[in-house]
């Protein structure tokens, strides 16, 4: 959750650059909503409960059986949070995607403890590749506000 809070801290600057943040989590929607409330996030946290998005980006992996056993021994049952029995997770990733759907920058690391600094994302948003077309700051849709996500 620390990464989401760090992104929340730079959200005003991101919006000034005409961008928005969308987080995608393998957790059930109810957990995503709870995280969003607890951290007072002003951006959407979407659920990828079957890891379909993670698979499409080549980020999904299955934990080796020894790690699954270790997780279970500590009482961490991913199926409770993710809603599926498989011990699969996405690699942490951050993408800068323009309005035409082109990935302008990507940061993916198999080591979940290594995350890009939000300042790096701000710098990527300041590049000419991002500013190929004029943009208006984006706001959360009324539908997402009504759903509480």
Residue map of PLM features:
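Conserved redox-active cysteine motifs that mediate thiol-disulfide chemistry
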Residues: 1-9, 13
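Thiol-based oxidoreductase modules, predominantly thioredoxin-like and allied folds used
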Residues: 15-30, 43-50
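Generic recognition of short, well-ordered alpha-helical segments
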Residues: 2-5, 34, 116
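Short alpha-helix adjacent to the SAM-binding motif of class I
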Residues: 31-38, 56
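Cysteine/selenocysteine-centered motifs that mediate thiol-based redox chemistry or coordinate metal-sulfur cofactors
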Residues: 131-149
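Thiol/selenol-based redox catalytic cores and closely related redox-interacting motifs
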Residues: 48-114
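A short, polar/charged loop-to-alpha-helix boundary motif
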Residues: 112-128
């Amino acid at each position: 959750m620390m990464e989401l809070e760090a992104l929340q801290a730079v959200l005003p600057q991101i919006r000034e650059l005409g961008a928005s943040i969308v987080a995608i989590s393998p957790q059930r929607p109810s957990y995503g909503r709870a995280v969003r409330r607890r951290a007072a996030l002003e951006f959407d946290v979407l659920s990828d409960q079957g890891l379909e998005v993670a698979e499409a980006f080549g980020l999904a992996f299955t934990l080796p059986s020894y790690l699954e056993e270790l997780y279970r021994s500590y009482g961490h049952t991913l199926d409770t949070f993710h809603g599926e029995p498989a011990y699969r997770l996405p690699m942490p990733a951050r993408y800068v995607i323009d309005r035409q759907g082109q990935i302008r920058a990507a940061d993916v690391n198999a080591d979940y403890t290594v995350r890009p600094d939000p300042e790096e994302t701000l710098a990527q948003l300041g590049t000419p590749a991002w500013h190929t077309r004029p943009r208006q700051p984006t706001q959360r849709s009324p539908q997402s506000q009504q759903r509480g996500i």
